[in-house]
Amino acid sequence: MWFAGPARRIPAAGRPATLRLGFSLSPGMRVGLYGGSFNPAHEGHAHVAETARSRLGLDKVIWLVSPQNPLKSGHETATQAERIAGARAVAHGPAMIVSGAEARIGTQYTIDTLRVLKARFRGVKFVWIMGADSLASFHRWRGWTQIMAEVPVAVVSRPWISLKSRSSPAARRFARNRVASAQARGLPDTVPPAWVFLRGPLNFQSSTALRERMRQAKA
């Protein structure tokens, strides 16, 4: 869903309109798109999603569970069905929708997914959501500057990485497009490129640490 190389061209109309994605959105809705491997999903992910939902005034947050992260080894990744089930276990509340839509769409990279969803749900105010750890490596994503031009982006603070992420290549490149956190609620209505960094209480869970504990338990 994410990284490296030039973005493919996705038709602005046609096939996207026929897709059955398992959720319905109406024009004018404010919708966060939260993509990731979620391998495994944990309360830190839920914290990022809920922080963005409440601070931005979002109607829905769609967790896009990727078929496979191109930067991660396949043997380290659980099946998409397992990761979707894990995400649903921690995604609390009716505003949270966990989806494997990318497998149905046939996209692997965020920029392509965004273009399909924008064509499918015209008039919906999408915001891309990521943790600060993702912002630190955002410049490695395929078509990352195009992502910034497609939708506003909300970055939520994460332990140990927030300072590094705010001095990352992406943060520097789009420094003048950063929205003050006090104006975060207006981000979905802002013409991109626009992004906000949301600070707040931190959740220290991480997928890496959870996988390591699982490996040790099996040893």
Feature locations, PLM:
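Nucleotidyltransferase catalytic core that binds NTPs
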Residues: 2-219
